[in-house]
Amino acid sequence: MVMHSEDEPYKCKFCGKAFDNLHLYLTHERTHTGEKPYECNKCGKAFSCSSSIRKHARIHTGEKPYICKQCGKAFRYSSSIRNHENTHTGEKPCECKQCGKAFSYSSYFRIHERIHTGEQVYKCKECGKTFTYPSAFHKHKSTHTSQKLYECKECGKAFDCFSSFHSHEGVHTGEKPYECRTWKSLQ
């Protein structure tokens, strides 16, 4: 049992970081233990906090509650719409100190940084192979299983890779998820 007092907040036994909130403390400790008690009943992916599994569920339900006021595009996550809004303003707030390249999306910037560090943050539990990019890692994982995690609600076609599933959705909606700005400017 974790004890605390007014003077002594919840303190991580692994790194000493202190928390005033029990929920934040328990979630933090899971970063050290690797415990992931929240499992998706659709695909089996596990998470260390309940809010993460609620956000993840949107992949399976197709829910996109965040709508861009400028163009009407819908997003699953609040962070995605914040990053998207930079495409309207042209703002690129994330700049690499190593090479000066700037990014609209913080996630693209974090991935770009790995070019300089060589960091490989994704490791396959099945074979131990490591990957720099999440897309390569997720594609690799499907080589170990025949399970398809993403199923189209319109036609039932299933995909093991989210990007392939997302591209397929355009067959039914007419949406083209990737737009070539060079081609668009030539028209």
UniProtKB/Swiss-Prot annotation:
Q: Where are the zinc fingers (C2H2-type)?
A: 10-32, 38-60, 66-88, 94-116, 122-144, 150-172
Tell me if Zinc-finger is a UniProt keyword of this record.
yes
Q: Which InterPro entries match?
A: Znf_C2H2_sf (IPR036236), Znf_C2H2_type (IPR013087)
Keyword presence, Zinc: yes
Q: Which GO terms describe its cellular component?
A: nucleus
Q: Which UniProt keywords apply?
A: Metal-binding, Repeat, Zinc, Zinc-finger
Q: Kindly provide the name given to this protein in its UniProt entry.
A: Putative zinc finger protein 833
* Organism annotation: Homo sapiens (Human)
| Listed GO MF terms | DNA-binding transcription factor activity; zinc ion binding
Which biological process annotations from GO are given for this protein? Answer: regulation of gene expression
